[in-house]
């Protein structure tokens, strides 16, 4: 099933990259709707969820990895900063304090709720997810700096547009899409972990994973944050990193999951 999903996403990505090389600007012109509620929810909601997940992951592995306390604190601050950006009223400082309190309460609650044996059981999975996510973040960030592609919503005229297959050397961070790459790697990680347990529903599970990724790609184009090719590149980066890591997960976690033949 993983092989079929990889082939489908790779072929779809290649086709969409070719389409983006020809129609990137036209597609963005047609879909741009910055007031689209669903797209706004995905744009603002996913970074908030991701930072909360990071704080929880670091909090649950900190018992055996003291350096994770730094990550826990950093993720908590980033969550609070993101919350203050989304909810600036009545006061940004009040929002920051409330957000930090909520994250700390949730993290401490889970740390006390889970037994040492339960935390030891899930710790390898959390570490594997963090390794995948940060690999994707680093690759995406480096490419953003190297490409310098301007975002659609930052363009003042069509002359500023540049194709995805050439570095643009402009003051932009459009290529590739960070929202898409981080969501895709998260969903693909969940697919790897859930597939053995839900093997009879593997086709439905794969469809849900693809639907989530494609919805994020669509929302980023609608918001004018990225062109089609930017979102496809983000998806393919996540797919490549997931495929490389998944082979290691099979060896490490195969005996810890309810696998099906």
At which residue positions do the language-model features occur?
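Alpha-helical transmembrane segments and their helix-start/interface "positive-inside/aromatic belt" motifs
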Residues: 1-9, 123-130
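Membrane-interface helix-boundary motifs at transmembrane edges
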Residues: 2, 60-70, 88-90, 113-124, ...
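N-terminal transmembrane-helix/juxtamembrane module of multi-pass inner/ER membrane proteins
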Residues: 2-100, 146-147, 151-166
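Membrane-embedded catalytic cores of phosphoryl/pyrophosphoryl-handling enzymes
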Residues: 3-10, 65, 163-261
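Membrane-interface loops
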Residues: 25-29, 114-199, 253-256
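Hydrophobic cores of alpha-helical transmembrane segments in multi-pass inner/ER membrane proteins
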Residues: 47-62, 97-110, 184-189, 235-251
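Hydrophobic, lipid-facing residues on alpha-helical transmembrane segments of integral membrane proteins
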Residues: 49-53, 74, 78, 101-102, ...
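Transmembrane alpha-helical segments of multi-pass membrane proteins
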Residues: 69-85, 123-136, 207-211
């Amino acid at each position: 099933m993983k092989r079929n999903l990889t082939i489908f996403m790779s072929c779809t990505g290649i086709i969409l990259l070719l389409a983006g090389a020809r129609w990137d600007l036209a597609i963005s012109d047609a879909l741009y709707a910055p007031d689209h509620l669903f797209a706004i929810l995905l744009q603002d909601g996913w970074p908030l969820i991701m930072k909360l997940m990071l704080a929880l992951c670091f909090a649950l592995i900190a018992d055996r990895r003291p350096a994770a306390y730094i990550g826990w604190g950093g993720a908590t601050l980033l969550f609070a900063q993101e919350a203050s950006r989304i909810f600036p009223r009545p006061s940004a400082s009040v929002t920051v304090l409330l957000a930090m309190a909520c994250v700390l309460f949730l993290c401490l609650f889970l740390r006390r709720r889970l037994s040492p044996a339960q935390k030891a059981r899930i710790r390898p999975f959390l570490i594997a997810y963090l390794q995948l996510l940060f690999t994707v973040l680093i690759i995406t960030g480096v490419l953003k700096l190297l490409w310098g592609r301007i975002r659609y919503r930052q363009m003042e005229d069509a002359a500023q547009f540049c194709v995805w297959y050439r570095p643009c050397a402009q003051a932009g961070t459009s290529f590739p899409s960070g929202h898409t790459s981080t969501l895709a790697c998260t969903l693909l990680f969940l697919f790897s972990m859930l597939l053995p347990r839900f093997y009879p529903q593997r086709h439905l599970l794969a469809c849900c994973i693809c639907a989530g990724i494609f919805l994020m790609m669509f929302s980023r184009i609608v918001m004018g944050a990225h062109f089609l090719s930017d979102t496809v590149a983000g998806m393919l980066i996540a797919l490549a990193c997931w495929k490389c890591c998944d082979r290691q997960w099979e060896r490490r976690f195969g005996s810890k999951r309810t696998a099906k033949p």
